[in-house]
């Protein structure tokens, strides 16, 4: 499918040609943006369709562009919040490791906005989790901890409100 062809960080020329052929066989484009969004692929799909020179129906192109702009903005806000959280943890002498999208967006993707993120995941030592919760609660625009899903793994969901966006932070 088109989404399968677009589900790659980079698209070499041969892959772009395959993507273009696949796109050429699509009769109904209406559901493509919502499917791409559902699978976290809207920004990558737009990037690869453009690179392949695919003639995308105008309404679909607009939807993909809007989704891409939204993800770019959200990732910028989340990245800024992540930098603040990591700086606060470092200042407190707490070692941490960024997991999942927060790391992958910056390590694998040519532009972080190509990797949609829903939250930030940070790993800390079990015995420092309570201190992390206190640090996060003291940050500007902090939101109270929502819940600890599993006390054995100290999985804590909390967050910050930044630039009109809720930045969910999961401490593992």
Residue ranges and their predicted role:
Residues 1-118, 124-172:
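Conserved NTP-donor binding/palm subdomain of two-metal-ion nucleotidyltransferases/polymerases, i.e.
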């Amino acid at each position: 499918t088109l989404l399968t062809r677009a589900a790659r960080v980079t698209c070499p020329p041969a892959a772009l040609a395959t993507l273009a052929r696949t796109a050429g066989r699509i009769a109904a484009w209406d559901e493509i943006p919502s499917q791409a969004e559902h699978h976290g692929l809207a920004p990558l799909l737009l990037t690869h369709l453009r690179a392949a020179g695919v003639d995308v129906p105008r309404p679909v192109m607009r939807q993909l562009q809007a989704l891409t702009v939204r993800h770019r903005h959200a990732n910028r806000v989340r990245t800024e919040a992540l930098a603040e959280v990591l700086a606060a943890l470092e200042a407190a002498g707490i070692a941490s490791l960024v997991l999942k999208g927060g790391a992958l967006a910056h390590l694998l993707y040519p532009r972080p906005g190509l990797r949609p993120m829903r939250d930030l995941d940070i790993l800390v030592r079990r015995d420092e989790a309570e201190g992390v919760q206190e640090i996060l609660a003291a940050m500007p625009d902090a939101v109270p901890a929502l819940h600890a899903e599993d006390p054995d793994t100290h999985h804590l969901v909390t967050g910050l409100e930044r630039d009109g966006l809720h930045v969910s932070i999961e401490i593992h």
